[in-house]
Design a protein with these regions (language model features):
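Ligand-binding pockets and gating/stacking loops
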Residues: 1-324
Length: 324
């Protein structure tokens, strides 16, 4: 079958003083182009979503290996004992919504205390964080202490790391009864900040997750992973990609600006990536999965800003320069 190249469906323009080329469907992100390092020469090994997610998160398509967040938490620890050191938030909208398996933030062969904790992005991020009716904090502390004592007795006999994990999880859950309500109380955010993100929080949007990510980072969470499901544009890519971009553009740009304003960006690495790219050839009115050349961007954390690294060939098919 003859393959026909599909032209860019939205105009590109040079943005910022660096002149980074960005599509016009990201008007907010284009204002922070000078903070980005854009990598245009990625390749991957898996052409379907789930194994490609696994490769991105673990470095292999083999399930059961520790995720990147688990390795970082294992190696570096967290700067807080009041909240999980590895938190995952998901949002959805704009296209075909491919599922994300929870093993993408699993700890693999590392102890399970290093796995990611998924927060709900709408409503209460952690269910049942409040005490049951008739149970005050003092009584709850007594219950946790009694359970921990029993777990400790058993662990002295079998020396099971999963028992130690369970003990740590109970302690974390108890502390989160105070730390999570404080995390979600946005009364300390200015109207200007909320307007910048375009959200009032806890509405399930990517923007709300970006705001929550900044608050988690402020409180010492080591690794925060945001997923937005809605990029699988096998058809109607012109309209669908614009719709998906609109859902993430403002929040992502606000996160970079907010981190910069708070002097946190230099110590916080922001990575915007996907599991693979899309073909330069048409698939009807869309594009198929593509593993031979695609892009990502990073900002902060010591990354050199305002630059483009690597390149594909003239068709955007193969990564040919500084391949990653």
């Amino acid at each position: 079958k003859k393959l026909t190249c599909m032209a860019p469906q939205h105009p590109f323009k040079a943005c910022g003083e660096s002149g980074v080329e960005m599509t016009e469907i990201f008007p907010h992100l284009s204002t922070v182009a000078d903070e980005m390092c854009v990598v245009r020469s990625l390749k991957t090994e898996a052409i379907n979503h789930d194994p490609a997610h696994t490769f991105l998160n673990t470095g292999t398509t083999i399930s059961g290996r520790p995720s990147m967040g688990s390795w970082l938490l294992y190696g570096l620890g967290a700067e807080t004992e009041e909240l999980p050191g590895f938190v995952v938030l998901t949002s959805v909208g704009g296209g075909q919504n491919q599922p994300i398996a929870s093993r993408q933030w699993h700890s693999g062969f590392l102890p399970s205390r290093f796995q990611g904790v998924e927060f709900h992005s709408k409503g209460d991020p952690v269910l049942y964080v409040n005490n049951a009716p008739g149970v005050n904090l003092e009584r709850q502390r007594d219950v946790v202490d009694a359970v921990q004592q029993l777990n400790g007795i058993r662990n002295d006999v079998v020396d099971d790391p999963e028992i130690a994990t369970r003990i740590a999880q109970y302690e974390m859950a108890f502390r989160m009864q105070t730390s999570v309500p404080s995390l979600m109380d946005l009364s300390d955010e200015t109207e200007e900040t909320l307007d910048m993100y375009g959200t009032r929080g806890s509405d399930g949007s990517f923007a709300a997750n970006c705001l929550l990510a900044r608050r988690l980072a402020e409180r010492g969470t080591r690794f925060i992973q945001l997923y937005h499901r809605g990029w699988d544009h096998h058809g109607n890519i012109k309209n669908a990609s614009a719709g998906t971009a609109k859902l993430v553009d403002q929040g992502a740009a606000a996160l970079l600006k907010d981190l910069q304003q708070r002097d946190m960006l230099k110590d916080t690495l922001v990575v915007w990536a996907c599991e693979f790219g899309r073909t330069p050839m048409a698939q009807g009115s869309g594009r198929d999965h593509h593993i031979k050349g695609y892009s990502m961007w990073m900002a902060g954390g010591g990354i050199k800003p305002g630059m483009t690294y690597g390149a594909t060939d003239e068709l955007g098919y193969n990564a040919v320069e500084n391949v990653v």
